[in-house]
Each structure stands twice: as C-alpha cells, then as structure tokens.
Amino acid sequence: TTWLHWAILVPSYCVSSAQRIGCCLWLDLIITLICLNAREPEHTSATVLIYGYIFDEEEKARDFAAWHQETYNRIKRISDQIPEEDKPEVLFNSHELGTKYTAGGSRYDQSLKLAGARNLIDKIVKEDSPFYGKTSVDVEPEWVMEQNPEYIFTSYLNPNSNAGFETEDVSGAAESVQAISNQTEFSELDAIKNGNVYYIDNFLVGGGGLNPIGAAYLGKLLHPEEFEEINPDELLREYLAFYSTETEPKGVFLYPSLEERV
C-alpha cells in the first residue's frame, strides 16, 4: 500500500512510525497524522492514554496503562536489586542472524535490561553513538569470540516459519536456535557450549506493550530465584484479557521453553 492509496482512502487518522514519518509528512495536509512511541516500555503507558483520548476509549486506556505500568515497575524492582556483576552478558539478534546485534536504547535492549542482563554491545555503542537505539549493529565475528557471551537470544524467524500464537510447532524457533549454535567459529563460546541459545518471539520483545512480558520470560530464565514470584504465562493471560480474546497463551514464545530448562 502506497501513501497515495492512503490519501485516496481519506482515513480520519493515520498512525505511523517514527522511521516512516518523513515519507508521509505531506499527508498531514489532508489527514491528521499521529506518530507516538508505543515500543519502548517506559513510554507505553503514556502513549496508550493519549490514544485513549483520541479514540474516545479513555476508561479502557486507563485500565491498560495502569496494568502495564504496574507490571513494568514490578519487574524493574526485581532487576534493579540484582548486582551488576550477577547479570549475565548477552547478545541479541533481532531482524536477522549472523553477527548483527541489537544496541542499547532499542526496544529489544530494554527487554534485556529489564530481565537483568547486560548487553555486550554497550561496550562499543555508547549513548552518543549514531548506532545507539538501533536494532541491528554489525560486528566482527572475532569481537564476538573475544566477548564470549553467556547467552545469545534471537527473535529472528525464517519467513516461511511460524512461532508465537500462530503455532505450537517449535520447528521454526528450533531452526533459528540451531543456525546460531551451528556456527563453527562460535563453537567455543560459553553460550554455545552450555546450550544457552534461545529464541524469544518478537511479539514479546518488539514493543506494543509486551516488553515487560518478554522481560518476565527472560528474567525467569536468567534469574529463576529472583523472579520466582513472577509467572510470565499469567502476565500474558492478563494482557490478552484486554482484547477480550482467548486468555490461554498457547504457542511458541520461548524456545527452549522454561519447562525444558527445569
């Protein structure tokens, strides 16, 4: 769909991402353009309240914003109490495999930090870097080997595969995990040797109010004692209840699953 098609349809509002804002500024001449941040968890509650006002759903928006903020704060309190030296050093592939990893300030990184992990990319991408906040930063394989991550996570999925709510078949997630684990140059990494390569569904870490839930799954994996009272599946049920949909979270969200690691 092109922006010209949108203009022909003449919607009341156009909701767009920050990355695409430059492509559609001209639409603002004829359509009310809305561009808000609903991806990073610290902005989600405020963004939902604004949308609630715009679309005359203020009560629902207040309920969701309160739940989201409470969930976010609850998980953050746990991770804030974990000593920095006890937080494992990790890398996260988001949009593709190989040696491209998410940087600090991105929505994926915020899920990692909320789960009590240290992002190794922070060592080379600082807040004043043009790559800060990027979801894919290319590094050399030699650098990865030098850093020796304790865990490697990915939300990448072969376009021909499914995960998340779409299936209970783990083959797609397993394919991504195996692709990372089978990289011969990384065979001596602690993450590979210890079987600490995981797929987490992009739905849980890619924004839209779910980052705290993704962080709950990761936190439960990385710090089972500290996150003992957190039930990620229950948080997902609570989230789904806002959509009046089936509240039993069935699908492939984390692979290998938490149950497989017990």
Regions found by a protein language model. Give the residues of each.
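N-terminal ligand-binding lobe of clamshell/alpha-beta domains
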Residues: 1-262
